[in-house]
Amino acid sequence: MRRKRDSYDYVIIGGGSAGSVLGARLSEDKDKNVLVLEAGRSDYFWDLFIQMPAALMFPSGNRFYDWEYQTDEEPHMGRRVDHARGKVLGGSSSINGMIYQRGNPMDYEGWAEPEGMDTWDFAHCLPYFKKLETTYGAAPYDKVRGHDGPIKLKRGPATNPLFKSFFNAGVEAGYHKTADVNGYRQEGFGPFDSQVHHGRRMSASRAYLRPALRRRNLDVETRAFVTKLIFDENNSKKVTGVTFKKNGKEHTVHANEVILSGGAFNTPQLLQLSGIGDSEFLKSKGIEPRMHLPGVGENFEDHLEVYIQHKCKQPVSLQPSLDVKRMPFIGLQWIFARKGAAASNHFEGGGFVRSNDDVDYPNLMFHFLPIAVRYDGQKAPVAHGYQVHVGPMYSNSRGSLKIKSKDPFEKPSIVFNYLSTKEDEREWIEAIRVARNILKQKAMDPFNGGEISPGPQVQTDEEILDWVRKDGETALHPSCSAKMGPASDPMAVVDPLTMKVHGMENLRVVDASAMPRTTNGNIHAPVLMLAEKAADIIRGRKPLEPQYVDYYKHGIDDEKAGAMEDDPFYQY
């Protein structure tokens, strides 16, 4: 894969989630030449660490797959936090947990509140979610889900008995079951959708970019690290191309339009390196400002999470699959049949709840796993175990990203300010207490062998917060660092109607950095939707018609609307 030209209609910087969508959609116009520049390597079909769903723990922290970012010392945690970012075609969709969650419809109603953002409400976003999905767990007549999109979604199956007990425990704790957290009712417990198809990871590159590579007007160049934007000599606001390095050599490519899709870390970094950002800050780094946009690198959001781990009394967990002696058999089973323990990401179910009555929609997310293991592969010292991942979904803590120098290869300074507000601390205390209350219900009694982490010694509010500060990890959802918003918003970077950078010509941003607020779930699906919608904007196509559908609203709809625990045909 390499470029065939020196000039293109569109140059897309980043072959990750958004870049893969854009490369495929923009090249549908046969009269337009498209180049995708990816700094990482190719996502080879034979690479087990990418393609095998259960191998998801191996790429993180591995320099061949992961850019290995770290925050600065977080001021309210007293330590640095590792951030894995995909160093491969497909970006982080090639190394993530493969969980597909749209977020709550109310997230997008919040996006649409500012002036000029009305076309980003749920009704306008829904048709693009449906366009990208093939939802095998949804009925053919389901008007909320998509049925013929490039992203193939597996529902559950969550057949391990621990899942059913966990869902029932949620009901015993006063919550409800839901058939589809991406459907009418997000609130409640039930099976999750995952981007796993025929036992393989369904990354954005596999779903979008690979099938489009047969087109003559689409080129993809890997190991191409973009170092700077090129500007018109007579117009400092007009972008005309990019410079990138590959194998130690510098290359230049010209473009009618440049689209930044490097993600929430790389996009603001490249903007600042190019003189777009806070003018005084840029001057302090020896960079001549081109456009004063103080929101570049600000408004930074992420989700923090912890694992609550339990010993399992019955031999039903997947803990034995972590035994190195069993791994060869599990691997061979996957290689030859795409079946067995390696054919699932094992994040097959969980739930969303409100931790208090002050919030209108779920502010806590739970991922349940029938195994006790950390994301880095460190397993709990038990024969059998299970765990729940939990964390607040719309924290009001905000961080920032700032370049350290003019060197494009030097990683930027990153601070998320986790746990920096009283509201954030309160929600964390609620999150742990809600999770523990669910895990101690009768439905879990046959399996509950006692809490391993944090352990019974952690009880008071301060003890809980100390544990979160010590043990909390990123859920890997960085976003909003170059947010969409009207020009009247001094912190907005991207025009929501055009995806162009305010005040600049031929420069757009399409990735997680453009999100105005993070959503209450994993952010991969919202990024795909954003890119699908942006592709129509960039191509000048008529947008898909908005679709106004019902969805569950707490305090307005009946409390049990869409709930499934009383349905005798609901298998969970």
Swiss-Prot record:
Pathway: Amine and polyamine biosynthesis; betaine biosynthesis via choline pathway; betaine aldehyde from choline (cytochrome c reductase route): step 1/1. InterPro entries: BetA (IPR011533), FAD/NAD-bd_sf (IPR036188), GMC_OxRdtase (IPR012132), GMC_OxRdtase_N (IPR000172), GMC_OxRtase_C (IPR007867). This is Oxygen-dependent choline dehydrogenase. The keyword Ribosomal protein does not apply. The lineage of its organism: Bacteria, Bacillati, Bacillota, Bacilli, Bacillales. Keywords: FAD, Flavoprotein, NAD, Oxidoreductase. It is an enzyme of class 1 (oxidoreductase). One of its GO terms (cellular component) is membrane. It comes from Staphylococcus epidermidis (strain ATCC 35984 / DSM 28319 / BCRC 17069 / CCUG 31568 / BM 3577 / RP62A). It holds the Pfam family GMC_oxred_C. Belongs to the GMC oxidoreductase family. NCBIfam families: betA, PRK02106.1. FAD binds at residues 9-38. Its EC number is 1.1.99.1, 1.2.1.8.
